[in-house]
């Protein structure tokens, strides 16, 4: 699978400042926001995010004029990474590539639940992220189907909705979530 630009890749590239010092601050803010949102949810303090990044609140607002801009930037950056993972796992056997990516997708969606819920599902950034995930994962699923390793009577949309349902469910232990995901994937795999 050759590297291809996804809609989200263009958004991430357009948002990131070109000056080295500004890019460093931007990256530090994204990392701090990821951490703060993971710990405190969507209501994490913007002042705390700026402090964690080692910048002033004015620098945060210069990069992200609103909380929504910050949510969208963190979300887009993470989806861009998820798309990169699809390219990385593409060299694996078809079923292994698909399941590796889907497991990463579940890990990603579980940790980004607060951000995802805070986003407007009709925003251009959200739609570009969704389209990018489909463009990244869809070929992995098609490859598994062509190799007769995945059922052909379901679509990638069906599969992603099922896996999204699992990732949006609260599990007291990660091992239980992994078991449930394994059972679901067994239902997608063709008989061997």
Predicted regions and their residues:
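C-terminal peripheral helix-coil segments that are non-catalytic and often amphipathic
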Residues: 1-13, 100, 139-150, 165, ...
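Basic, helix-initiating cap at the start of DNA-binding domains
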Residues: 1-43, 47-52, 69
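Amphipathic alpha-helical interaction segments
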Residues: 28, 48, 96-104, 158-162, ...
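Amphipathic alpha-helical segments enriched in hydrophobic/aromatic and basic residues
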Residues: 37, 45-46, 57, 67, ...
């Amino acid at each position: 699978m050759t590297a291809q630009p996804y809609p989200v890749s263009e958004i991430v590239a357009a948002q990131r400042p070109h000056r080295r010092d500004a890019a460093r601050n931007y990256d530090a803010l994204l990392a701090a926001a990821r951490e703060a949102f993971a710990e405190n949810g969507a209501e994490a303090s913007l002042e705390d995010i700026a402090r964690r990044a080692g910048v002033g609140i004015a620098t945060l607002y210069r990069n992200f004029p609103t909380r929504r801009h910050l949510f969208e930037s963190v979300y887009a950056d993470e989806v861009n990474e998820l798309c990169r993972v699809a390219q990385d796992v593409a060299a694996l056997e078809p079923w292994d590539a698909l399941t590796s990516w889907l497991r990463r997708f579940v890990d990603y969606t579980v940790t980004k639940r607060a951000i995802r819920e805070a986003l407007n599902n009709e925003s251009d950034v959200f739609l570009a992220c969704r389209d990018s995930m489909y463009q990244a994962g869809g070929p992995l699923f098609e490859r598994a189907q062509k190799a007769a390793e995945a059922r052909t009577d379901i679509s990638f949309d069906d599969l992603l909705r099922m896996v999204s349902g699992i990732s949006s469910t609260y599990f007291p232990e990660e091992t239980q979530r992994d078991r449930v995901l394994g059972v679901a994937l067994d239902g997608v795999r063709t008989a061997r």
